[in-house]
Amino acid sequence: MPAPTTTLLIEGTFTELADEFAQYIDALRKNEGASLQSEIAPLIEPLRQQEQSEEEPDRKQRDEVLKKLVGAAAVLNAAPEKEIISAYNLLVHLVHQASNPDMFLSRICTYLAKPITTSPQFGPTLAISILSTIFNTLAPTDSSRFHVLLAIVAVIRQSGSSYAFEALKPQLAAQLPTWLSAWELDDEDAQKLHLAVADAAQASGDLELAQTHVVQALQTIPANESSSKEARDLAVRALTSALKSPGVFDFTSLTAADAIQALRSSDSTLFELLEIFTADTLDAYEDFIAATPLETISGGVLADGAEALQTKMRLLTLASLAASTPSRSLPYATIASALRVPVEDVEKWVIDTIRAGLVEGKLSQLRSEFLVHRATYRVFGEKQWAEVQGRLMVWRRSLESVLGVLRTERERYIRESMQAAAEETGQGKSGDKGAKGGDRRRNPQQQQQSQPSQPQQAREVELVGGAE
């Protein structure tokens, strides 16, 4: 897989290696047609003289030699398995000495995207290895990497190897946005790459990633081309895939695309179905299907998705129901009625909706209700803002009530503490007067016994006040 930039180390001058490569091609051809070595001999002779005299090589002359070599290189796919990698590496080394390697590399990539006939089992692995080497010999900003990556993805798609695609996925996730920016691709090439990745992901069974790249390809379509046939076909593909995909519940990125909005005119029933899945419930969906069978929508692209669509619509309906319930408690009977399912199946549908990430909560079998902790809003408009405002007002009133209780209790505590302190002070003064008048009548032991009783009474009053 693509990795940091590397360098091919191959000994020999350009003319020596070109002559060697031509001999190898002639051997693979088995004397069929004109000899490649004899064809390039007149072309490499001036270059050989330049090399011997250590003059600056004529790159245009090299290009003429490379045109012959690269044009005949398709036969490399019939080379012995153990020689294929070294033969292609030699050709890549020669191509890097051209005035413009890009014009040759794209053709080499097309060869490698085709089957390697001498190794049906390991051909894709060999091709990916060679293409990865080519990719890594190019500078990170070299736009030729685009053609190489396209070829890598094409080989993976044709092979159907989920292992190879899994090895490529981390690179796509971490590097693809950076590559697209560095290569400065136009919208058409960016779309081509996203669709190639989507096809490879679908072939390997990763439908979620395939859908992601189809949507990204859709977003490359300029607004002034959103009504073209190509844009319409891609929009129908993206929308159909999203509706049938079991993991797609957010259609925001689709509805924001100009090409999807253009379906309002070209495929009005398909666009109407999108609007139902975006904001409506099962009742509206079933009314729509009764009037517009799936087989009649956009050439029947959804004809095989009836069950998947109904399942998704039930999950979305439950999410809307949970989000719009003020009490945050949904009786089983209410859910069963909204989803058109038996009451005994309610728990299954709630669990499926939780797994889809649309709601969070707890099932209460004892009370036959679903306690909603969190619910996803499918759309967030004026109605939803009003609901949020209402809930915030309820929360505010609740907090104000709690604050009022705390304020009242604090004031009562302060008042009672002050009263207790005043009583303690008054009792202390009366005790001092009694002690002065009774000194002559009491012995010291009696004085010591009588004095502690007064602070003890004050502490009891203070404790009672604090407890209250």
From Swiss-Prot:
Stored PROSITE patterns = PCI
Which domain of life does this protein belong to?
A: Eukaryota
Molecular function, one GO term: translation initiation factor activity
GO:BP terms for this protein? Answer: formation of cytoplasmic translation initiation complex
User: What are the Basic and acidic residues biased-composition ranges?
Assistant: 430-442
What does the UniProt keyword field contain? Cytoplasm, Initiation factor, Protein biosynthesis
Q: Low complexity: which segments have biased composition? A: 444-457
* Cellular component, GO annotation: eukaryotic 43S preinitiation complex; eukaryotic 48S preinitiation complex; eukaryotic translation initiation factor 3 complex, eIF3m
Q: Where in the cell is it found?
A: Cytoplasm
Record region (Disordered): 42-61, 418-468
Query: Is Chaperone tagged as a keyword?
Result: no
Domain PCI: start-end pairs? 206-377
Specify one Pfam family: eIF3m_C_helix
**What is the recorded function of this protein according to its Swiss-Prot or TrEMBL entry?**
Component of the eukaryotic translation initiation factor 3 (eIF-3) complex, which is involved in protein synthesis of a specialized repertoire of mRNAs and, together with other initiation factors, stimulates binding of mRNA and methionyl-tRNAi to the 40S ribosome. The eIF-3 complex specifically targets and initiates translation of a subset of mRNAs involved in cell proliferation.
What family is this? Belongs to the eIF-3 subunit M family.
Describe its partners and assembly state. Component of the eukaryotic translation initiation factor 3 (eIF-3) complex.
Its protein name is Eukaryotic translation initiation factor 3 subunit M
Q: Which organism is it from?
A: Neosartorya fischeri (strain ATCC 1020 / DSM 3700 / CBS 544.65 / FGSC A1164 / JCM 1740 / NRRL 181 / WB 181)
